[in-house]
Each structure stands twice: as C-alpha cells, then as structure tokens.
Swiss-Prot record:
Gene from which the chain derives: rpo2N
Keyword terms: Cytoplasm, DNA-binding, DNA-directed RNA polymerase, Nucleotidyltransferase, Transcription, Transferase
Similarity comment text for this entry: Belongs to the RNA polymerase beta chain family.
Localization per Swiss-Prot or TrEMBL: Cytoplasm
Catalytic activity: RNA(n) + a ribonucleoside 5'-triphosphate = RNA(n+1) + diphosphate
Subunit structure, interactors included: Part of the RNA polymerase complex.
One cellular component term from this protein's GO annotations in UniProt: cytoplasm
EC number, UniProt record: 2.7.7.6
InterPro entries attached to this UniProt entry: DNA-dir_RNA_pol_su2 (IPR015712), RNA_pol_bsu_protrusion (IPR007644), RNA_pol_Rpb2_2 (IPR007642), RNA_pol_Rpb2_2_sf (IPR037034), RNA_pol_Rpb2_3 (IPR007645)
Gene Ontology terms describing biological process: DNA-templated transcription
Pfam families cross-referenced by the UniProt entry: RNA_pol_Rpb2_1 (PF04563), RNA_pol_Rpb2_2 (PF04561), RNA_pol_Rpb2_3 (PF04565)
Protein name, UniProt field: DNA-directed RNA polymerase subunit Rpo2N
GO MF annotation: an example: ribonucleoside binding
Function (record text): DNA-dependent RNA polymerase (RNAP) catalyzes the transcription of DNA into RNA using the four ribonucleoside triphosphates as substrates. The Rpo2 subunit (Rpo2N and Rpo2C in this organism) is implicated in DNA promoter recognition and in nucleotide binding.
Length: 523
C-alpha cells in the first residue's frame, strides 16, 4: 500500500463521525426501535376501575411511539427549531417532544369493548444526542455549522441538559444469560459454583447452583431466602423421574455417581410434593392454596426469566428451565472433577458493554412505568368525579420528562448506579475525544480488585493499554483502542437460531433419551 493511500485511509477512519460512532449507532437504534420495544412490552395500563359491582373495567392501550426533532416553546407560545448552541447559551435542555398513540377502552366480560378516546398525544420530552439522526444539525455542511455557531470539528455524542454538556459513560458488565463456573469458599470449605445473570426486559436475576461440602447441589435465586435442593426444584419444574434427571445432567459415569447421591438425599418424589415444599419456603405460615399459588408465581417470575418467550406455553418454559439448571449442575460437577477450569471473569468474551442507547432504554423503561402509574391515578380520579375520560386530560407530560432528564443531569442512574453521566471534559480537544471513548467498570474503587485492574490478553486491540487514570480508578476506568469496532444489536438470537436449525442442530428439548444412548453405543 502506498504512503498516500495509508494517509487517506487513516484520515477517513479517524474522522469526527467515526470517533463517537458507537454512541450514535446505539442511540439511533434506541430511537428507531428501542423505544417502541419498551412500549410494546408494556402494551396496556390496567386500572382499578371495575372492581366495584355494576362498574365496567377501563384500561389504556398503548400504540406507536415516536420522537421528533428538538424544539423550544417561546414565551408567546410559538414553537421553534432548537440548535445545540442556542441550548448551551440559554441554559435549556436540548430535547424533542415524544408522541404516543393511546386508547382508553371500557368494557367487561359480558359487555362489548368500547373505545372511549384514541389520540396521539405528547407524553413528554426526550433528550437528544448532539449529532444523532434526530439532531437538527445532522447532515449539515461545515459552512452551515459555522453559520449557526457550531464547531465543525466537534464530534458530538453527548447531551445538553440545562445548558451543560453531559456524556453517558459506556458501562462494562458481566455477560448476562451465560453460565460461568468458579470456585468459592463457604464456612472455610472450597465449593464449586455455577452462576448465571438471567436478564430479560430490564429485570436481572442472579441464579446460583452450588455444590456444598457434602457434595449436594443447592440452588439460590431471588425472592427465596436461603437455598433450595436442586432435585426439589427440578422436580417442581416438571422433571420427575430419576432417570430423566440424571440423563439431562450427564451420561458420564462419575457425574452419574454424584447425581445418585443427590437423588438419594431428596425429600420429594413428585412434582406436586416439590411445589408444596417450595410453597412452604416462600410463604411459610400461609394457607396451602396461597402457598401453591405463590410457589408457582416465584418459579415462573423470578427463576431464569431470560428463558421466557412470548407465545411459548408455561409448561414448555418450565421444562426449558429444568434443562438449563441441569447444564449448570453439569458445570459444577465438571469443575469438581477437574474436567474444566474455572471461567475467567476478566476474559472479554465474558463481558458486555452498555452504550448510550442501552442506558437510555433502561431509563425510558422506568420513566414509562412512572408515567403508567400516573395515568392510572388520573384515570381513577377522573372516573370517581364522573368526568369524561379523554387521553389528553389523563396524561401529564412533565412526569416522563422529569424521569428522563434528572438522571442525565445528576448521573444517578436506575438500579442505584452513580456517575453514569458526566460533564464533558472540555480541557482540550483531545480530552473531549478521550471522554467519548471511555468506559467504566461497576466494581468499587475502594476495593483492591487486582485481577480486574490488570491488563488482560483479550483486551488486545480493543482497550488502550496505557490510557487509564492514576490512583484508585487505575484499571477500572479504561478507554477504547483507536481502531476498535463495537458490535451492536446482537441481542436478537432469532436469526442465529434459524441458521443453526437449517444446519440440522437440534435444541436440547428435542433430544430424546433413546437418541443419546444410541449415539454413545455407536461411539
């Protein structure tokens, strides 16, 4: 390659659009389909209207949502286009109105459903990233940018809240929905643990399968105090026979021996007994019917939520959860037998990065839930006073706006995280570029965390080895390497599943016991 070609290539690669491209791509994806995904998840807002006798239920159905370009309402009531420089000088927020289709529906089991009011109403304002597709200066030439007071070399990728420039820090976290096996210590003994951070629709649950010092497996997950016997939980999920449980864990003779020890110690033999046992744990002292109801709710809601799929029957989902727990049990046993090494938490294959679009999606989800609670309250109040129920009277747009702007202004994010949003470092031009490409670890800087702070071989070409601060943040706050590419929109696994299916790969539930035994005999 000629010297001129190399220069041209490097200049085009390190242009201002490329330096903050990971922020733009993530945020644009959030505006295009991320917001709509959150609204589709919510689907409808239920109310308490209809609880009394002779009263028809009322609910709100949510439709399409869209954000327009940033505007400002002047004192005379007129709306004008807002540019970033004007927002900086006037100390206002660079945000755009968000419109959502909402329908108020009334109807009961006997009565036909009637739509009382349908309209696209303004539900709040969304802070817009400077330089994103919805930004008013997107696509402007250098001359046009200079004309409106913008710096043509400014990379964008930040928000303007009350006149202050705020950048969202890329967050580094352990990969969700992935089994990680490791050693741990309990009561002075070394034990084997398989864990997974099960995540779905903003809810994250840590599920642990531990092999205690007696060699028995125990499972811990949210909303259940202490741990539950592995065999009890798997039977509650629908795997009843000893043979089926052993087969789903492993066909290896040594692992089968471990599993037989667990089955001998089991207190329950049927699914009904297992659910009763679980009910006594999650609702002790309550009536039997309530205990059963609560036990079913807990295993459906809090145990491995990422295995829930829309349109899949509950029974099938439970069996899939049982198979997943069996895989976790196998990982524990393999670790105990020395067949596998403990997973490296610092390996970059076990890490995932949350960029601005992912962070905004989390924020929008909590803001929408707050808006839904407010709409429910306003509807019930209007109904109690016998007022006409219309969309515009029950939606207060400042509720959503406040929940979106305040965390970006302060840096205090949902889930108790702080320092997610920071003031853009304007010390010099390189400081801005560095700040836009910075990422932070959720680990506490007051703890040693020597291994997490160390350079890892898998960071080669992804993370800059030298750009990290001195002092307590050393190794926890890092920066992207210059030629780093961040893959995005990889959460949707449907295409991957279709591709694997076309290659003849069978899912775990489709593999029968006869198939496995035949295969092992042929080997």
């Amino acid at each position: 390659m000629l010297q001129e070609d190399k220069r041209e290539l490097s200049e085009s690669y390190f242009s201002k659009e490329r330096l903050a491209e990971h922020h733009f791509r993530s945020y644009n994806a959030f505006l295009e389909h991320g917001m709509q995904d959150v609204v589709t998840e919510k689907e409808r807002i239920e109310t308490d209207i209809g609880d009394k006798e002779d009263e028809e239920p009322v609910w709100v159905e949510l439709g399409d949502v869209r954000a327009v370009t940033p505007r400002v309402r002047e004192a005379d009531g007129s709306e004008e286009l807002l540019y970033p420089q004007e927002a900086r000088l006037r100390n206002i927020t660079y945000s755009a109105p968000v419109f959502m289709e909402m329908s108020i529906v009334r109807g009961g089991e006997e009565e036909e459903e009637r739509v009382l009011d349908t309209t696209e109403t303004k539900v709040g304002r969304m802070p817009i990233m400077v330089g994103s597709d919805k930004c008013n200066i997107s696509g402007f030439s250098d001359e046009e940018l200079i004309e409106i007071g913008e710096d043509p070399a400014d990379p964008g990728g930040y928000f303007i809240i009350n006149g202050s420039e705020r950048v969202l820090m890329t967050s580094e976290d352990l990969a969700p929905n992935k089994i990680l096996a490791e050693y741990d210590s309990k009561y002075g003994d070394e034990i084997q643990v398989a864990k997974t951070f099960s995540q779905r629709r903003g809810y994250r649950a840590l599920v642990l399968v531990e092999r205690n010092r007696e060699g028995l497996l125990e499972v811990s997950f949210p909303s259940v105090s202490g741990s539950i016997s592995f065999v009890t939980l798997v039977r509650a999920l629908g795997l009843e026979s000893d043979e089926e449980i052993v087969h789903r864990v492993s066909e290896d003779p040594e692992i089968v021996k471990f599993m037989l020890e667990n089955l001998e110690e089991a207190d329950v033999q049927t699914q009904e007994e297992a659910i009763e046992d679980l009910g006594q744990r999650v609702a002790s002292g309550q009536g039997k019917n309530y205990q059963l109801k609560r036990a079913n709710y807990v295993i459906d809601r809090y145990l491995l939520p990422h295995l829930h799929e829309d349109g899949v029957e509950e029974e099938e989902t439970r069996i899939n959860k049982a198979y997943y727990l069996c895989r976790m049990a196998e990982a524990c046993f393999e670790l105990a037998l020395g067949r596998r090494e403990a997973d490296d938490k610092d390996h970059y294959a076990n890490k995932r990065l949350k960029v601005s679009g992912d962070l905004m999606k989390d924020l929008f989800r909590t803001a929408l839930n707050k808006l839904a609670r407010d709409v429910k309250y306003q509807l019930e109040r209007a109904n109690m006073r016998n007022r006409e129920l219309t969309v515009n009277t029950v939606v207060r747009s400042d509720v959503l706006t406040e929940r979106l702007e305040h965390p970006i202004a302060t840096g205090n994010w949902v889930g108790g995280r702080s320092g997610v949003s920071q003031l853009v470092d304007r010390t010099d031009f390189m400081g801005v570029l560095s700040h836009l490409r910075r990422l932070r670890s959720p680990l506490s800087r007051s703890q040693p965390h020597f291994e997490a702070r160390d350079l890892h071989a898998t960071q080669w070409g992804r993370i800059c080895p030298s750009e990290t601060p001195e002092g307590p943040n050393c190794g926890l706050v890092k920066n992207f390497a210059q030629a780093m590419e961040l893959s995005q929109d990889v959460d949707d696994e449907r295409d991957l599943k279709q591709e694997l299916s076309s290659m003849g790969v069978e899912g775990i539930p489709g593999i029968s016991m006869e198939t496995t035994s035949t295969t092992s005999a042929d080997d």
